[in-house]
Structure formats: structure tokens, C-alpha cells
């Protein structure tokens, strides 16, 4: 992030990281740089720590995948393939965008999985 801020001293619109930890780290690195006050910091994975960072005002949003649906659709496609059926080239397993409005609900949902 230091390199980005050095190369773009006037700020940029969005930082889109490959995962939540990288997005949170980038947001924290830019925290004291006023040129980045309006930058959107986006992570991927929908981790509890990212949702908490959203509630704390550190991260703008994250995108959460649904691992159950990803696995289910993968097995479903494999069965279709093994049965000689045509398999879609692209299979969308869905996602959820987690923002300040939905972060607490997302945290509660993830925590409920470990309570079962």
C-alpha cells in the first residue's frame, strides 16, 4: 500500500484486494493519509474479522462466497459430466456483499455455524 500511495499521492477511488486480510491491511496503512479518506477498500472472503473491520469503519465492504453451494454445485456438475450430460461452462454459486448495513447480520450468521 505504501507503493500505491507513493505512486498515487492524490488518492484513488478503490482498492480491491484478493482477500479480506489484504484489504484490511491496506485500509490501515492508508488510515492517516487524507488523500485516501474517500477510497473504497474491498476485500473478498467475508471473514468475521472483515465484517468487524467494516463495523469499526476500517473496511468498506467484503464479498462472501458460499462454500456449501460451491461444493454442492461442483459435485452436481461432476455427476452430470460422469453421466455424459452437458455441463455449463460457468456455474455461479452466488455471493453476498457485506456492508456496514449487513455486517452484524453476517457475523451472527457465521458464528451460528460453530454453535451447531
Question: Which role does the model predict for each range below?
Answer:
Residues 1-116:
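A residue-level marker of the well-folded mature domains of exported/periplasmic proteins
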Amino acid at each position: 500500500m505504501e507503493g500505491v500511495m507513493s505512486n498515487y499521492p492524490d488518492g484513488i477511488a478503490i482498492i480491491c484486494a484478493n482477500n479480506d486480510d489484504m484489504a484490511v491491511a491496506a485500509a490501515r496503512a492508508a488510515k492517516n493519509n487524507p488523500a485516501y479518506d474517500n477510497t473504497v477498500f474491498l476485500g473478498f472472503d467475508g471473514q468475521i474479522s472483515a465484517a468487524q473491520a467494516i463495523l469499526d469503519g476500517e473496511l468498506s465492504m467484503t464479498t462472501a462466497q458460499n462454500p456449501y453451494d460451491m461444493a454442492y454445485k461442483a459435485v452436481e456438475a461432476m455427476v452430470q459430466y460422469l453421466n455424459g450430460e452437458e455441463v455449463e461452462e460457468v456455474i455461479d454459486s452466488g455471493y453476498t456483499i457485506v456492508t456496514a448495513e449487513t455486517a452484524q447480520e453476517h457475523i451472527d450468521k457465521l458464528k451460528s455455524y460453530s454453535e451447531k
